[in-house]
């Protein structure tokens, strides 16, 4: 697990470097895979490893992959809320559908697992988890304002630091679905 943690933090930092300094269109893949692996290495030491049960990991990955397809159909194709201006079909499929959505959800899941270890009261979770979801979404979206792997079309409610406010609320919905999945797949102990 130590190697996974080192590799994870290196990939995470590479993702940040690619976004902030190179303005690379593939920064997000490194960022989310690295963030997931790094937090997985921390959480596994605390007795909560998603990797420990391969069937659970693959089920979560597939569920997040399907969720990403549904989000893309509704938000991108039907509502035209965002697009990926520099991606052809192959890169879109690889970096958005296969890597992006599953790993950002796994990264978010690891983040929420880590937080629940510090806040033992389930009452505190009702305050901490929504705030954490918005902060997690903000970090993902703000970093993208330097690289623009995806771009938003004008949306209602305005923007905050280049991020549509409605998108921050959608992150809240996306990441708060994860605790339900955590109960279903037995990640809470």
Question: Which residue stretches match the model-derived regions?
Answer:
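Aromatic-rich, lipid-facing transmembrane alpha helices and their immediate juxtamembrane interface loops
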Residues: 1-189
């Amino acid at each position: 697990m130590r190697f996974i943690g080192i590799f994870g933090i290196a990939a995470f930092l590479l993702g940040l470097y690619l976004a902030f300094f190179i303005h690379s269109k593939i920064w997000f893949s490194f960022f989310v895979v690295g963030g997931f692996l790094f937090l997985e290495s921390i959480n596994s030491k605390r007795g909560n490893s998603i990797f420990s049960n391969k069937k659970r990991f693959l089920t979560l990955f597939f569920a997040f992959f399907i969720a990403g397809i549904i989000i893309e159909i509704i938000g991108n194709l039907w509502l035209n809320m965002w697009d990926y201006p520099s991606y052809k079909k192959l890169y879109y499929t690889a970096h958005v559908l296969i890597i992006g959505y599953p790993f950002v959800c796994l990264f978010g899941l690891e983040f929420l697992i880590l937080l629940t270890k510090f806040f033992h009261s389930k009452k505190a979770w009702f305050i901490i988890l929504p705030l954490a979801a918005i902060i997690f979404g903000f970090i993902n979206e703000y970093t993208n304002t330097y690289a623009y792997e995806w771009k938003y079309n004008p949306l209602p409610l305005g923007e905050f630091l280049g991020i549509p406010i409605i998108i921050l609320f959608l992150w809240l919905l996306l990441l708060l679905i994860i605790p339900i999945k955590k109960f279903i797949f037995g990640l809470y102990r």
